[in-house]
Structure formats: C-alpha cells, structure tokens
C-alpha cells in the first residue's frame, strides 16, 4: 500500500491512482493495515518520481484530484486506517513558483528561498558532490550565479536559514493536517540545514557532508516544527535519515528531544554494501542480524522495514546471498529463498 504507482488498475499499467487505493481499502483493512504511507502525490514534473515538487498544495493529475484525496482520507478513517504523506522539504522542483521567482533576479523577494552563490576564480563555489554524483552546483544563466542541489539539478535546495521558508512549510503542514492526514514521512530530513558552504573533506561519496549531515540547525528546525505545528495535532512523524549512528538517531527521535517520533535508518540495508547500495560487497546474514540487534537495543523507536521505493526486493537481494542471478538457478535455491522469505516476514510482523 506504500507505493500508489503499483497495481491500482484504474489507469494504464503500471500507474495507479488515489481512486485505486480507495477501491482496495477493505482488503487493506482485512490485512490489518493501520497506516498507508503515500509516496509523493503532489504536482511534479517527475524528474525524481515526485520528489521534485512543483506545488505542495495540489495533487498530480495522474493520481487524481484534491477531492479524491479528501475521500481517501475519509474512507480510510472509517476503517481505522491513517494516511501518511511524504514530506519533501530539503528541496523543491525547479519548476516550483518559488524557484521561478528566485532565479529571475538577485533582488527578487524569493531569491533567498534557495541557496545561491557566485563562483570563485571561474570555478564552482565549493567541491561538494551530489547524492546523484557530480557537483552540487548548477550555474543559472539569468544572473550568472550557482544554485545548490544535493540531488538532481532539477531539485534546488531550500535555504532554511531564511525564516520565510519556515513560515511557508508551517503553512503547508497545517494545510494537510487540517485536511485530516495523520502525519508525514520526512524525506532526507537530516540534510536540510547547511551550516556552512566551505569546501569539504574529499570522500568516495558525498564530499562536503560534514557541513550538512545532522547539523544543530536541523534539530532546531524540527523542534520548531514540533512546537508550532505537530504538537497541535494527533499526528505522527518519521524521518528518513542519511548516514546516522544510533546515537545520532536518538538525537532526532529521543522522547525528550521534541523532534521526530521515529526514524528510518539505512544501516541494515547496507548488509551487502558500503554506505551506498551501489558499492556492493558480499552479503553476510550475520552482518544484517548484528545491525538489527544493535539498533533495536540502542534506538528509542526505529522503523522495522526492508523495502520501499529506494530498496530492491529483499528476498531477491539478500536471499540469493551472492547477489548474482545465476544463484537462483542452483539446486535447492527455491527452498532457500522460501525459508528466507519466511524469516524476513517473521522479522517484520512480530
């Protein structure tokens, strides 16, 4: 039920829609589902599967209308199912009206909604590298300055040092909570605040991350959102976190912190990789179990998950052990995969 672009069947395959989810609510209720997390259904040019939002207050026509969304919330509530939306507040689409205004001129009131810098001696403002590889800077020909994008160049980062950005996001959160949603899954939430724009230590991945990963400014933002918005509603927040330790996770979701309720960590999803699913190493079950036990013992409320839009199917990925397709054709492989599927199901549902 997490991914609305699968199997709804009311649009041409493989795209689904909100009406399709509504049609499956009885089935989901029968399964015992209590929460449906919707990946982004906002208006978007879909450079990054909806994580590039061009309008936070409307529904992408492919998925339906605001009326469909209100009906989904209402019908789900009748079945004691809550709706959680994706919240993407590190960046917007470059087609969002804020960014269109921002890039139009240095003196535009929306200029400081984003992070703009001039180049240095014909070079980019710093040496940071993107989550999607390559530099984080894109030169805009209108003013000759560069804008920061930790992800795609179509996803300019918001400037959380600007109080107006906070006010805009507070208003958006209230808009959806007043409509009746039950909370938010907060996308890459621990990278939203950039303490400085200095050059970073050169790394295999994410050069510059020491200037934006889990900064104190991020904690201040989350506490302010909790104080001014979330505490006024019966709602739930879970943060997707990047490269965090259990101690760092507790700083985000510890009961006394007043920030998030829960975190999604990637640690157990790195049992066959090195801090990045593209840097593969042989899978070892003991590595997976060790990480799960560590986080279970040390983190207040860690999400128990294996799959989402970022992760391949677990049984195929971990169950084949070497990760090679030909492993699946070996004698006994089918039985081994079935046992692994049962094991992961037990871990998720008990």
Regions from the PLM with identified roles:
Residues 1-350:
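Active-site and adjacent substrate-binding regions of carbohydrate-active enzymes
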